[in-house]
Curated annotation (Swiss-Prot):
It holds the Pfam family COX4_pro_2. It is a single-pass membrane protein. The keyword Nucleotide-binding does not apply. Residues 50 are periplasmic. The keyword Translocase applies. Its EC number is 7.1.1.9. Coiled coil: none annotated. Its main location: membrane. Keywords: Cell inner membrane, Cell membrane, Membrane, Translocase, Transmembrane, Transmembrane helix. Disulfide bonds: none annotated. This is Cytochrome c oxidase subunit 4. It comes from Paracoccus denitrificans. The lineage of its organism: Bacteria, Pseudomonadati, Pseudomonadota, Alphaproteobacteria, Rhodobacterales. Not required for enzymatic activity or proton pumping of the cytochrome c oxidase complex.
Length: 50
């Protein structure tokens, strides 16, 4: 039975990763904002409680 997938040799560094890089950059930006907001809320709560 014939295979429907062509088997090729892997060549390191030839894959287009622009979408993965953009997704990772967005994730890092979002994680940074969530961290900053969380710290700001904690500081506000600490100051409001004192």
């Amino acid at each position: 039975m014939a295979s429907h997938h062509e088997i090729t040799d892997h060549k390191h560094g030839e894959m287009d990763i622009r979408h993965q890089q953009a997704t990772f950059a967005g994730f890092i930006k979002g994680a940074t904002w969530v961290s900053i907001l969380s710290i700001a809320v904690l500081v506000f709560l600490a100051l409001a409680n004192s």
